[in-house]
């Protein structure tokens, strides 16, 4: 709590220096409930984009109860927060659609020596990321190339075994502007589960970035989970099904569902999300 008081003083000092008047406080984590007693504000927003099961439920309950508006990134999150607030609004994740929908410069090939199918994933390779399906597929299909683009965080237990496979590429991180080059180099894009995230109806920013490219997507699901976007995403429940659906995705006719995928992403573009936020806050009298 002492750190929260210190952070509260820091924020208050910055707000005073910039002559903030009637500020709208935007919070994104239940931990920030401890700042409320140390800040002056005229409106409070709680923007929830994940399940915070590792934090005390009372923190999130208090934050949602105090908030004038609660934004929830999925229907399940909205249902969970509804008992704590009568002003819960659904606000799904968004995407930089112009960046990811623009075809890559074909003169640049991030994998110039690679032939055959390329299947890729982009993001931080966290310890909680379940890469078992990738390991199974890479061992079974040695002529396919699998790319894990992104920083390796604190280390994933399967990385040592993946590094030993000649058909697994670990290029590390890159600037966001270069990520589309890698995605467009892939024939199929992949999404995996995280052991610390169990909210199964959340459409991630990564998924929206994938969809903006129009490329086929194969995603792992929890055992009882239903794919939220079944018309544009191949959803697998096991390592074997993951490999089978990767084969189906590679065999997908050109442009079979590319436009539907881009349409899903276009509907989640950040300008449209911002318009939704402005309309909701205006209706609530916060703007």
Predicted regions and their residues:
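Carbohydrate-associated surface elements
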Residues: 76, 94, 103
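Conserved donor-binding/catalytic core segment of Leloir-type glycosyltransferases
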Residues: 111-129, 134-138, 147-149
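Nucleotide-activated donor-binding/catalytic signature segment of Leloir-type glycosyltransferases, i.e.
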Residues: 116, 150, 156-181
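Conserved acidic donor-binding segment of nucleotide-sugar-dependent glycosyltransferases
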Residues: 232-240, 248-254
């Amino acid at each position: 709590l002492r750190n929260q008081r210190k952070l509260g003083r820091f924020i208050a000092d910055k707000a005073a220096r910039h002559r903030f008047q009637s500020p709208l406080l935007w919070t994104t984590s239940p931990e920030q409930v401890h700042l409320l007693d140390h800040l002056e504000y005229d409106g409070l927003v709680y923007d929830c984009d994940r399940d915070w099961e590792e934090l005390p439920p009372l923190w999130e309950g208090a934050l949602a109860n105090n908030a004038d508006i609660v934004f929830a990134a999925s229907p399940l999150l909205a249902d969970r927060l509804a008992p704590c607030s009568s002003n819960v609004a659904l606000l799904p994740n968004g995407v930089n659609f112009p960046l990811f929908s623009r075809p890559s410069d074909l003169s640049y090939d991030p994998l110039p020596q690679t032939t055959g199918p390329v299947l890729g994933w982009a993001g931080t390779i966290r310890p909680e990321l379940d890469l078992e399906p990738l390991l199974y597929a890479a061992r079974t299909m040695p002529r396919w190339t699998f790319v894990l683009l992104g920083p390796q965080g604190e280390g994933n237990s399967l990385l040592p075994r993946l590094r030993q496979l000649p058909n697994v590429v670990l290029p590390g991180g890159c600037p966001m502007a270069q990520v589309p080059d890698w995605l467009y180099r892939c024939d199929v894009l992949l999404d995996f589960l995280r052991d610390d995230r169990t909210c199964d109806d959340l459409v991630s920013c990564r998924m929206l970035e994938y969809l903006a490219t129009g490329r086929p997507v194969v995603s792992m699901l929890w055992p009882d989970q239903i794919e939220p976007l079944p018309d544009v995403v191949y959803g697998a429940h096991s390592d074997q099904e993951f490999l089978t659906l990767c084969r189906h995705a590679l065999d997908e006719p050109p442009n079979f569902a590319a436009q539907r995928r881009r349409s899903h992403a276009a509907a989640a573009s950040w300008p449209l999300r911002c318009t939704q936020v402005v309309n909701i806050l205006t209706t609530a009298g916060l703007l």
